[in-house]
Amino acid sequence: MYSDRVALYKQLEEAFDSKILAYITSDRPNMSAQIAPDVIDYFIDHLDKIGPCNKISLVLYTRGGDTSAARNIVNLLRMYCDTLQVIVPHKAHSSGTIISLGANEVVMTKQATLGPIDPSLHTALNPQVPDGSLFPVSVEAVKGYLEFAKNELSITDNASLASIFEKLSDFVHPLVLGEVYRSKAQIQMMAEQLIQNQVADPDKKRKIIAFLCSESGSHDYTINRREAQNELGLNVKKPSLEQYELIKKLYDDINDELLFSKPFMLTEVNGAYTVRRCLLESVVGGSDYFSTEGVVVRAPMPDGQIAIQNRINFEGWRHDRSSDNDNLAITDGEEAIVYERGADYQT
């Protein structure tokens, strides 16, 4: 719980000589979450309370999400600090890696991993699979299909390649294929802009972006600390033993609350439930969380079976009142302004 973590945040601030902000999107099976634009306003609330400072360290755990939201988070954080550090306890994949590229340095534990940043598209025009859901279209999957035809099957004449592309468009809507091309170009441009604060050498930047956007081969590929530092050339730091122990304690406490590895099963729920799926926390800003709240109702069927109904009553962000201090100091970089929360503070 936040009441246990706030002491760890304070110790981390001392250990890194920085202001700590934690952003966690759960990958719990059946109750996962992603980086999304709706978190931006909550970042602003926390950063306004932190105020302009020399250094901000973002503790980040995520499997990815909206790439534009990731870019906006980096740009917003940079408005409040001179140096941006990202601390990766475990996973910062896809859009999480985009955020990491925008930092001046990335602190990775020995178990931490980054990942490719080639986007997967989720649109209403995506192909439908037998269970009725929409199948995400990966930029690299489309590229791999076309390269397989050219490189492995040795198809080079334009007429045959056109036929292969037409066959692809029978399964993937042409507008989705167009969006694939646009997204790849956008990701490359975004990565080039963000990485400037971490890597100066143009050739090294091109190498990093090319690998993350296409040459890794699979969106599931993971990049450990050694590869990120020695082979890619990112500005990666190893935490000290003291720093690592604090990071690990923080991760374990968050995992105990969000249950990353425990699938959410309706068959195991009876009655009301509340599941926290995202966290955004700081010492002065308290704890904001994205929650899904509902009721599981069991009803007997004529054939003797039991039907399980999941009635979701609320899904969105809430503020944890128990994380509030009676008085919070807001600073504009010069003089601290102290105010007391009113009874009308939003929950």
What are these regions (language model features)?
Residues M1-T347:
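Terminal-region recognition feature
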